[in-house]
Amino acid sequence: MSYKRLINCCVLTFFVLTAVAQSGSNSPYTRYGYGQLSDQSFGNSKAMGGIAYGLRNGLQVNAANPASYSAVDSLTFLFDAGMTLQNANFKENGIKTNAKNSTLDYIAMQFRLFEGLGMSAGFLPYSTVGYNMSKSKQIGTDPYGNNIQALESYYGDGGLQQVFVGLGYNVFKNLSVGANISYLYG
């Protein structure tokens, strides 16, 4: 029985490592600006349609509502991670392309510092960039009348990542305040 668990853990680890290595986007629109902005919500709020600001539960990490950090119990340490699998189909001039992407959505932890004071820290992707396009165009003719073609290639991969730390404090019953500090890099 223990060998079966070990094999399952190795297989799952392989999938997670593969997921982190992917760009997460195949959209030509990510060429402009910051790229495609990532969904900043965690699994519990995604399951309820993206709602996050009104959730305050001591058993869930909610970076969108830092005041909710104060609800964590003194004996609780929360660790949360999530990933997304995405399938996209593109069609241009009769050419069909299928792209499968997997991304690490977030890693976060939450714990209680003192009575009424909770803390959370984690990592969230802010945006993703992933495109690989090329086009050929005529740039002139040679002395024999043949067209001269040039191939323009555009490639981009990466995005912005966000590391955050936040505190939430329960001022009095039914009133909590909180704030996050974030650092963007990429």
Placement of each model-derived feature along the sequence:
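Subset of outer-membrane beta-barrel
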Residues: 22-186
